[in-house]
């Protein structure tokens, strides 16, 4: 607690008292309830933590860390968005939702024109991280989605294990479709991933999409993939490369905190960016820490 207080004091000293408060928005956090008869997970799926990560657990963490808002990304345990939307309904100034959709069913296209009429819904998050879902990118299963989402004016966050280059064609063909790369293009935000993934190559692939103005990127893979303690210096070179390619208005601070609790406190996840990355100016931090994702998702 003493260290956290010292960090908070350090952050306050960075900005003049006359400056407006920086809005801090975490662009990715998973919420889920306990497994029960009315909240059943799909077979073969499991949560990132043994216990639920709930609204009531998140709010005090946010307050302690100085996080103003969170983009809830429902976990890939099923295609349900109801608990995330409940959070947004109860706390509309704190939570918004990037909802999941049954991508394998073309009939889901009928949901998109009114998708954002659901209170708190900001867009869609799609995942291609298993052999069956990865196949959707090449066998035509997902083809219906990109023009439908573009027509509906929806922002789309995507996780595509090893297949980020495929999105160059999607970004070019659908220039009005807002695309947001998860985890800096890395396979996950877990340090176990470091054993198998060529991180420099994955970063190269993500940077290659920076030429498309409709593409932006989340930093959610940074801390979880670090093999060092705070302030995670081994990831700084990758953060700077991504930032230099995309610029402050297309880079989004995100924690995926439930995937990396053991790595750092929530407050450290904030100060990592606000205090430890010398290549970021104060204006850059304003964009990266919240202003950019609010603009990208049109979240007022």
Regions found by a protein language model. Give the residues of each.
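Mid-to-C-terminal alpha-helical segments outside catalytic/metal-binding sites
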Residues: 1-12, 22-27, 43, 47-69, ...
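Active-site neighborhood of phospho(di)ester-bond hydrolases with catalytic His/Asp-centered motifs
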Residues: 25-27, 72-73, 98, 125, ...
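Active-site gating loops and adjacent loop-to-helix segments of metal-dependent hydrolytic enzymes
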Residues: 33-56, 61-65, 118-127, 177-178, ...
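Active-site gating/metal-coordination segments in enzymes
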Residues: 68-69, 78-162, 169, 218-222
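Catalytic pocket-lining loop regions of alpha/beta-barrel enzymes
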Residues: 122, 135-252
